[in-house]
Swiss-Prot record:
Name under which the protein is recorded: Dihydroorotate dehydrogenase (quinone)
Membrane-topology annotation of the record: Peripheral membrane protein
The keyword Transport appears for this protein: no
GO cellular component: cytoplasm; plasma membrane
Keyword Hydrolase: no
GO molecular function: dihydroorotate dehydrogenase (quinone) activity
Entries under Gene3D superfamilies matching the protein: Aldolase class I
Length: 381
């Protein structure tokens, strides 16, 4: 039995009706304390429980070494509060953000909901973050970097769409020396008009501005929505080639509701008592988790085939099991990210997936990892 999945999760979210965002922030505060105090005993215990290292899992991409292909997706640790802890939880890389040039509070609460019938979540966070300068300072203080760190960039809510390039550029200028790769997020459904920036004529000036500034040739990717039509994806792939992008992150959350079992969004209320509900069709926000799995894999496969496998893909969306992970890798993903599945399954999900992937992987002759007993803090990406 999975104690977290089968006991703790139902108690928190179904029984006590805890606010998912409050639970997440409580966990982040705890991880931040571990990070800030360098609680070596706790970090060592986490490593023993959740780290699984095997040379067959290593991935070499963009001049970086990923100890394994499983990363934490953007949105969980937006401000890099626990950068020193994620390696001890087994992740092969972490993506922070979405970051905007200035701090912003995001959308009104409540803005994060669990949909257990669908093993999904609905969020309308709205890029709440402490701003690029705060993240830059945190990254400068980071003493060790055992796994690559990606930075997800976004537009502020108050910035007009026609000035979006300036926002992405401002954050990139502050952070370009501190991130290992960068992701242009133009696909969140929770910032008004943002998805329109996926159109070629709107995306082109953003990519042009960033690549002109990108003198150190940091890997630059675009994160796309699962709801795009194939011709729209083709246009983005043409831009990716024209602007020498390093890859695509596929995909963000979906606006579709037609395949959900959940009909009403759970309301807040007294624990273990009936609560008010609201029709989910009337609720704004993007859906992540299991309902996204099939479509995100379709998009990965389409990109892989359209580019003859020449454009690396970070696959994200609906990964809960080894079969889910293998499906995306076989579709053409080079790396994987998890978020909602990790929230549902718990921290034991990472080593479980990695063990399965190692059994399914051929040897990786071009990458050598440190011995299995090397402390994670001594591994340099």
């Amino acid at each position: 039995m999975n104690l977290y999945r089968d006991v703790l999760w139902p108690l928190l979210f179904s029984g006590l009706r805890a606010d998912p965002e409050a639970v997440k922030m409580g966990l982040l505060r705890a991880l931040h304390w571990i990070d800030a105090t360098q609680a070596t005993g706790i970090l060592s215990a986490l490593e023993r429980l959740f780290c699984y290292r095997d040379p067959r899992l290593a991935v070499s991409l963009w001049g970086l070494t990923f100890p394994n292909p499983l990363g934490l997706a953007a949105g969980f640790d937006k401000d890099g509060l626990a950068l020193g802890v994620w390696p001890s939880l087994g992740f092969g890389f972490v993506e922070v953000g979405t970051i905007t040039p200035q701090p912003q509070p995001g959308n009104p609460k409540p803005r994060l909901f669990q949909l257990p019938q669908d093993r999904a979540a609905l969020n309308r966070m709205g890029f709440n973050n402490q701003g690029a300068a705060a993240l830059a300072e945190r990254l400068r203080r980071l003493q060790q970097r055992p796994i690559p760190i990606g930075i997800n960039l976004g537009k502020a809510k108050i910035t007009p769409l026609e000035e979006a390039a300036a926002d992405y550029l401002a954050s990139f200028r502050l952070l370009q020396d501190l991130g290992d790769y960068f992701v242009v997020n133009v696909s969140s459904p929770n910032t008004p008009g943002l998805r329109s920036l996926q159109a070629a004529e709107q995306l082109e000036p953003i990519l042009s501005a960033l690549q002109r500034e990108n003198q150190k040739r940091k890997p630059l990717l675009v994160k796309i929505a699962p709801d795009l039509d194939w011709p729209d994806i083709d246009s983005i792939l043409e831009l990716a080639q024209d602007h020498q992008l390093a890859g695509i992150v596929a995909t963000n959350t979906t606006l579709r509701r037609d395949n959900l079992k959940t009909r009403f969004l759970p309301g807040r209320g007294i624990p273990f008592a009936p609560a008010e509900s609201r029709p989910i069709l009337a609720e704004a926000g993007g859906i992540s988790g299991a309902p996204l799995r099939e479509r995100s894999t379709q998009v990965i496969r389409y990109i892989h085939r359209s580019t003859q496998g020449k454009l690396p893909i970070i696959g994200v969306g609906g990964i809960f099991t080894l079969a889910d992970a293998l499906e995306k890798l076989e579709a053409g993903a080079s790396l994987l990210q998890v978020y909602t599945g990790w929230v549902y399954e718990g921290p034991g999900m990472v080593p479980q997936l990695l063990r399965g992937l190692a059994r399914s992987s051929p040897p990786s002759p071009d990458v050598t990892l440190p011995p299995e007993n090397t402390p994670v803090g001594q591994i340099q990406a």
